Amino acid sequence: MTWIGCFIVGSSFSLVMPFLPLYIQSLGVTGANVELFSGLAFASTALVSGLVAPMWGKLADKYGRKPMMVRASFAMTFTMSAIAFSHQMGGYWWLLLMRSLMGFFSGFIPNSTAMIASQAPKERSGYALGILSTAMITGTLIGPSIGGLLAQWFGMANVFLIVGALLALATLLTVFFVHENFEPVAKSEMLSTKEIISRVGDKHILFGLLITSFIIQVTTQSIEPFVTLYIKTLTTNTNNLMFISGLIVSAVGLSAMMSSSTLGKLGDKYGAHRLILLGLVFSFAMYLPMAFVQTPLQLGLLRFMLGFGTGALMPSVNSLLAKITPKEGVSRIFAYNQMFSNFGVVVGPLLGSAIAGWVSYRMAFVVTSLFVVLNFFWSLINFRKYLRKRSIVE
């Protein structure tokens, strides 16, 4: 049921992505402000969520992850549904407020991840977390196509009500069917975040994993602001431009979904730290050629192959975090990981669009690949004394 809940939450966020700019336009926003205000609406959720994630993580360590999952999906039921009434309640600023509150009350997926990480046997944590990550990836992948159809059939405002109903379903499923083996920690025994970090054996690895989560999101999100324009330069046939762009953007999610559980199992067998290094090398080998492609097909194939690198990185990062973190602080560490990921979601599109606008589309891919190279060498330095070992946990 945790998988189903993560799937619903993941798809709920992506369902509204295809038509949100059009909905903002219907609220009276015109001209160049549509792109600006759409960017603010998207970024506000991720930014606020990242800022408050440590607070919710601390509460999860104190009261349990399941209550935080229920809290998140229950609150998002109302904030998402309320966007349907933006025309009556204050237009764009109401929408922006609800999107920000959605970010404030979010936390379903990181708490699900922390719960699985704390309960799964450590020798199988990569496999378990890999399976869980497919829920979010699958939901995010199919959400935009379903959202576009629902908007055509029922109208844009009603889609927010439908998504609210889905989130209510996720709340009920979590309340009645998700079980957590959580032992409350006495207030006197509650560790501070500083104490939790002090108990992590190698703090360089912890910080390196957080940076890796940040860079995964920066690199995967950086293409989205200009992918349609880049594809337009690669072909003279613009009849199906939006459809082709959607396929190319979603290709990385499809292959990541296909591979993450299998690669997570390989990480358990051969070492998640080794898999991270291989994933970064492979990702670099896919990113750099994207700067030199001549056709949309070439770009799409490279994006599809890139997903196998992403599928190796995400469960491996989560698995290592679970292994090096004391159980009293799992939720807080995963909350910080979510914070770094969300900041990557905000920075990625800004960085990609800035480089594409100031230099060129192709240079944006070169810079992205350099970020991956830097992350590889940093990780190599952090993991250097564990390369001959299957596990970094003594």
Regions found by a protein language model. Give the residues of each.
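Short amphipathic helix-loop junctions that connect adjacent transmembrane helices
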Residues: 19-35, 226-243
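C-terminal ends and interior cores of transmembrane alpha-helices
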Residues: 74-89, 282-294
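Juxtamembrane intracellular "pre-TM" segments in multi-pass secondary transporters
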Residues: 179-209, 394
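Hydrophobic core of transmembrane alpha-helices in multi-pass small-molecule transporters
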Residues: 7, 92-107, 298-312
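Helix-to-loop junctions at the C-terminal end of transmembrane segments
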Residues: 51-64, 259-271
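Cytoplasmic helix-loop-helix junction between adjacent transmembrane helices
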Residues: 98-136, 320
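Central cavity-lining transmembrane alpha-helices of secondary-active solute carriers
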Residues: 40-56, 250-259
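Helix-loop junctions on the cytosolic side of multi-pass membrane transporters
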Residues: 171-187, 381-392
